[in-house]
Amino acid sequence: MYDFVVVGVGPAGARFARRAAETGYDVLALEKGTVGEPLACSGHVSTDIWDYVPEDARDELFQNRIYGANFYTGGPEADAHLFYKTEEISNVIDRVGLDRTLADCARRAGADVREGHTVTGIQEHPDHVDITASVAGEEGTTAFEAKMVAGCDGPVSRLRQAAGLPEPGEKLHGVLAFTDEADHSDHVDVHLTVPRFFAWRIPRGEAGVEYGLAAPPGDDVTALFDRLTDAYGVETDRFCSGAIPIGPPDTVTTDRVFLLGDAAGQTKPFTGGGILYGMTAADCAARHIRPDSPASLGVYESAWRETLSTEIRMGRLIRRAYSLPEPVQRVGLRLLAGEIGVHMDKPSSFFSKDHLRRLLS
């Protein structure tokens, strides 16, 4: 019997598998396909990402440095409002490579990471969980037993449903695609032209340029995306689509199952990004969850919320600005634009002494 079976080997799942294995637990991590595929997420992250990967992987993963963002209330021809820092705000990285690097870290720590394993069902018992999985290229199913199961299988989590846990508050429909021309620009472009969210353009160095957006269900994201790329006069390829969970549910644990990452809605409400929040929650889980102690799941539940709830709550407030009337948005952007002292993962840093000093100057 395993101490933990981890379902899904994205950033949150790989991080937890690594940390739990480093603690000495027997960990099995199952990925339904190939780690990192298909791509369904941007690779624009804060520089904190380098705290989670080996130093020798940085050169391979790194694509571009970002120092600021141009905000628009219209298309690229509209007036731009530049928000910037003199130091790097964020980096653009190889998103598929990140997943594979984190999975390799879990393997080196001692976790058994298996690709091509799709979990088809679980059954909780007082002292363990039965897990059933299909294996690519094989008939029938394979059974595993674990003391605890970590559901890290994304926004449309099969494990969450099987465990009877509630859904995230909202799921946006995100799309992105790429052009191939090199672009080493040091700022991203953000367009407040999408209902209740935004569209973006991210220069990825030699890897090309990423165009994307997210919108609530019911909005025609394809038409919105075509409008974005038409405004820039580009044709894209490698089109990707996926759900973006916004708002964690009231609980992400049962007696022997817990959720991490997108499956738990552990994302930034104002950007939809969840890589750092998911790995932060994974560290909380690894610190507090003990496979022989169902009560420790309650400690994890409290710990991750205490760590992230303020940022998630403030992120919701920022997102409300996306729905303000355009004239109000223009005034707000004009007043706030310039040098900033805000951390892109921590909206509470808007009230930091550093940011307020720069804002007032």
Residue ranges and their predicted role:
Residues 8-13, 147, 261:
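Conserved phosphate-binding and hydrolysis motifs of nucleotide-dependent enzymes
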Residues 3, 145-147, 256:
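Conserved acidic residues
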Residues 121, 217-292:
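FAD/FMN-dependent oxidoreductases across multiple families
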Residues 32-75:
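N-terminal FAD cofactor-binding segment of flavoenzymes
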Residues 156-222:
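Conserved FAD-binding catalytic core of PHBH/FMO-like flavoproteins
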Residues 290-361:
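C-terminal helical "tail/cap" subdomain of flavin- and related membrane-associated enzymes
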Residues 58, 64-65, 70-162, 172:
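Conserved N-terminal helical subregion
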Residues 5-9, 15-41:
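Glycine-rich FAD pyrophosphate-binding loop
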